[in-house]
Amino acid sequence: PVLDYHVHLKGGLTKEVAARQSRQTGVNYGLAINCGIGFSITNDTELYNYLDTMRTQPFILAMQAEGREWVTTFSEAARNSFDYVFTDAMTFLDHKGRRTHLWVNKEVIIDDEQAYMDMMLDRICSVLEEPVDMYVNSCFLPDAMSDRYDMFWTEERIDRFVNALAKSGKALE
């Protein structure tokens, strides 16, 4: 079977539309809900309520763990209620303690691009130690840096990332 592990219900994609598309294409969907501070699901009660509405649907259910505090925001029992859990390193505290969402340009404050890249790689390697099954959006760069991808993702940095990933035993999207 073919499976897309990272599908979100948004932009007009409802569970009904997703089910129909899945049947038509033969691709099974892992539906993910964003869970964390400032996201769709922010506590165990909301998480269980969401799961109650989805258990009868023809999908594998995933938790996309957001922010680095998700491990303490949600109980282990609640997290384990999903079929699998994945995360990325796109929400974190930067080197000055500012909450950063890498896709929100105004939150990405870069003084020194190479130092910022090193900080992002540190965050990625730390995230790989979190209790998840899969790491996603693996090498995302903010808009201010994305046009020079090869300059920032050097062989040395790639090696560090790949070694940390291998050590973690996690799947990579």
Residue ranges and their predicted role:
Residues P1-E69, P142-S146, D150-E156, R160-F161:
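An N-terminally biased module of ancient metal coordination in phosphate/nucleic-acid-related enzymes
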Residues Y5, M63, T87, V136-N137:
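Active-site flanking residues adjacent to catalytic metal/cofactor-binding acidic residues
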Residues H6, V85, L172:
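Conserved, mostly hydrophobic/aromatic
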Residues G12-A19, E69-A77, D118-S126:
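Short, acidic/polar
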Residues V27, R55-T56, D83-Y84, L165-G169:
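Structural alpha-beta junctions
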Residues N49-A115:
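Active-site gating/metal-coordination segments in enzymes
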Residues S81, A89-F92, H101-E173:
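Domain-core and long-helix interface of multi-subunit machines
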